[in-house]
């Protein structure tokens, strides 16, 4: 149920990142935005102007009459706004002093500092968007590739919401038939028809949930990035690989073994797949205390990574350290990179292929940029069988909360099928069907708890 705007006070926050810039935006939302602005803005009478218009003027300190900044003020009237409330946005010169001064004046003359995510929370509570769309706002802000941005936009447009609501409607139609059976128990054929319909509907909805969950692995990668550990013994080209993928020098590249003492993390877009690259310290036996800590962190990175890129030096024979790493990573999703192929080959390729298993083997010379296109294509196809474009028009589930609720809803439908198979009365089976309906409703926010909203929106930034 939507909450009316009269239940909300007027809030204000800075919507642009802190620091110096071209402009800053202070956003106000609520019933009294015009009263607050009228006390500060010298220019047009904002109470008389039309919606979605921009007006030039100045912000003055009402107490001293001093001019604070030259501004442009945008007026947006309810309900056609982000929050479905009256909104005023003050565009001032970028910078910490002027921006904070204007915000403080807004707070001094009737507004309250917004909580993190409160604008989006109001958009949800006022019925402009559902919970899935609200969560997609943060996904859009955090998107690291064009594809992850597209998925977030699709969810913001309601693609996932529409699919979930269709599933809920299918369940609701089935529940209505159950009510007929309960109201007319004297007709035996009604119960038979109802249980048959419930079985078919439970199977049908479960299959659609299964199809949606099949996108979860790819969706999670797009939303959170692929945790990718670059591992290998010292001085095989790990940092060079990191720098090449980043197209900049983030890691130190030298001929000295053990130069990378810590774990370096960076995000990079590889063929539309967001990678969270983890350049680890070279793994070897060492007496250096600092390097030892880095080596231990490298081992942990291997265990938690979604993808391991194991770099071997093709210009040297396989060492005991190489063999140990091949063993340590054999149960991971990995790519073997045979680097320095521009030098005379010393590595026993047959021996490497024998222990590689299903792991792709890519021959590279990072120094000469050979083999890198093949590496990037391999990464993309490991997680998107036909490439990132193959999922272009697919509704995807990317959020761990949604994935968990879909699994729970599927389990509830299992209980429906098992209950009917066991000969349970229809009114008892109805309980599990209703549970599946409620669980799907938690995805879109058609049913929710206040604690959930507080947790979700606290992850947003101020001003959004």
UniProtKB/Swiss-Prot annotation:
Gene Ontology BP annotations: tRNA methylation; tRNA wobble uridine modification
EC number, as in UniProt: 3.6.-.-
Positions annotated to bind (6S)-5-formyl-5,6,7,8-tetrahydrofolate: 27, 89, 128, 464
Binding site residues for GTP: 235-240, 254-260, 279-282
Gene3D superfamilies per record: P-loop containing nucleotide triphosphate hydrolases, Probable tRNA modification gtpase trme, domain 1, tRNA modification GTPase MnmE domain 2
Top-rank lineage group of the source organism: Bacteria
InterPro entries recorded: G_TrmE, GTP-bd, GTP-bd_TrmE_N, GTPase_MnmE, MnmE_dom2, MnmE_helical, P-loop_NTPase, Small_GTP-bd
Residues annotated as signal peptide: none
Xref: Pfam families: MMR_HSR1, MnmE_helical, TrmE_N
Matches recorded under SUPFAM superfamilies: P-loop containing nucleoside triphosphate hydrolases, TrmE connector domain
Subcellular location: Cytoplasm
Cofactor binding comment, as recorded: Binds 1 potassium ion per subunit.
Family recorded in the similarity comment: Belongs to the TRAFAC class TrmE-Era-EngA-EngB-Septin-like GTPase superfamily. TrmE GTPase family.
Cited function: Exhibits a very high intrinsic GTPase hydrolysis rate. Involved in the addition of a carboxymethylaminomethyl (cmnm) group at the wobble position (U34) of certain tRNAs, forming tRNA-cmnm(5)s(2)U34.
Description of how the protein assembles with itself and partners: Homodimer. Heterotetramer of two MnmE and two MnmG subunits.
UniProt protein name: tRNA modification GTPase MnmE
Species whose genome carries this gene: Levilactobacillus brevis (strain ATCC 367 / BCRC 12310 / CIP 105137 / JCM 1170 / LMG 11437 / NCIMB 947 / NCTC 947)
Gene name per UniProt: mnmE
